[in-house]
Amino acid sequence: MAASGRGLRKAVAASPFPAWRRAHTEAGGGLKPEYDAVVIGAGHNGLVVAAYLQRLGVNTAVFERRHVIGGAAVTEEIIPGFKFSRASYLLSLLRPQIYTDLELKKHGLRLHLRNPYSFTPMLEEGAGSKVPRSLLLGTDMAENQKQIAQFSRKDAQVFPRYEEFMHRLALAIDPLLDAAPVDMAAFQRGSLLQRMRSFSTLKPLLKAGRILGAQLPRYYEVLTAPITKVLDQWFESEPLKATLATDAVIGAMTSPHTPGSGYVLLHHVMGGLEGMQGAWGYVQGGMGALSDAIASSATTHGASIFTEKTVAKVQVNSEGCVQGVVLEDGTEVRSKVVLSNTSPQITFLKLTPQEWLPEEFLERISQLDTRSPVTKINVAVDRLPSFLAAPNAPRGQPLPHHQCSIHLNCEDTLLLHQAFEDAMDGLPSHRPIIELCIPSSLDPPLAPSGCHVVSLFTQYTPYTLAGGKAWDEQERDAYADRVFDCVEVYAPGFKDSVVGRDILTPPDLERIFGLPGGNIFHCAMSLDQLYFARPVPLHSGYRCPLQGLYLCGSGAHPGGGVMGAAGRNAAHVAFRDLKSM
């Protein structure tokens, strides 16, 4: 195995082409001067838009800036032989209607469900020769209770009730994801007909209220309170509380003590895969295979997808209606509608002529909170990490915990808060929160034989360092070394196993994937930027102040994650408008 690692290191150094290109240039035919609809950006939401509109008979073209489709849902061979889900790395939130409507299995989508799904190893200094404890959670409730009982018998008894409580809340929120938010603009200043139509947008909200019933005040607290307050009402053991709290802060520049952090937790528990509520899994072939399946569904019905075609400007006619886009090379492409999968900031502050948008609207867009705590590190290793709390098997084959989200520096909610406080001072966390995943444990072809791809989703790292200092190569390497040192404490030998690494700080995530501030949700999933306030109040229904322009990415309702709901909802809104044009 070690010899294999040395050979791989030589290959990495010698490779002139470190990226696995999945080009879709001119998929669906050559560039035409006019389409019914143009989509800016081939992220998963943009591809979902194209697939739905094309199925509805709307001739659609997608223009992508990069050489590869998928936005943040991509597979790239950054290190020769190692195929990484370079940004997004897990699947759960994709709406079930999209699986079936777009026939994604028919178009090649294959999943690896994870069970167990969560592993939190302890360090427990002073344990002598004893193996440190760990917390392993999966779909077997009785086994979960045994695991939790190591830390608290009371928590073990309560855990099933907590899971049922959260499941009920997720069930109530679910209908809100698949429809445009309540149309407040129509209620306030629409015609009588518009006001009557807008009443239909109340149905999902009323349905949610019926499901929650008399428990509504308690559920309201979950959405508005700090997650520590919520978890303290249920549990006493820190390893369990900290493990659950990681889902409340992941991707968010917030502490577990921040009011409203409970919603982000809910956002990450309301998914499911293949009928299993709350299940998370790996896409076979990496996240890019999901984007490929959606693209295949779109192009099979006639959509056109173009890579390395950057949209420079949204075109507007003299009457204030969208009439297409201009590409970076000067090519004009006409269309009746334009749907933007890019962030609200890029869409409205860079691509759209400012004179056609209200000043107040532009000001609100410029004020969106896009702070990001995330640095993603993709690592190629020549063997599986062996954790002190769960040593490897003699032959090094994957064990159940290797398929999990492995939570490091997460034994106590205080550790999460301290990591956050460092970033508030402009410093990368001294002891970063780390979610370590090894997708090749279930999908071996992602790496050479005996080797593995490791995803390190870490926080907190500010966009700008203390004193206004920008990230440079030295700072990036120093932070990655710190993360590796942390992993080494839990899994000795990890650093020696490393073949290569790809470090993506917040500025890197912004530059490569167009994520403003490096924010994986396009803008924060805080209560003031959700539902009918996403991206801004009175413009949450995918339509924009400019007729014919729609927002269909993560900056629109219901927000970030590989969900596809924003794309699906926006496609239906645009289609209804097209029918009346």
Curated annotation (Swiss-Prot):
Subcellular location: Mitochondrion matrix
Annotated family: Belongs to the carotenoid/retinoid oxidoreductase family.
Binding-site residues for FAD, renumbered to this chain: 38-71
Entry GO CC: mitochondrial matrix
Subunit structure: Interacts with COX5B; this interaction may contribute to localize PYROXD2 to the inner face of the inner mitochondrial membrane.
Protein's name according to its UniProt entry: Pyridine nucleotide-disulfide oxidoreductase domain-containing protein 2
Annotated function: Probable oxidoreductase that may play a role as regulator of mitochondrial function.
Keywords: FAD, Flavoprotein, Mitochondrion, Oxidoreductase
EC number(s) on file: 1.-.-.-
A GO MF label: oxidoreductase activity
An individual GO BP term: mitochondrion organization
Top-level EC class: oxidoreductase
Alphabetized InterPro entries for the sequence: Amino_oxidase, FAD/NAD-bd_sf
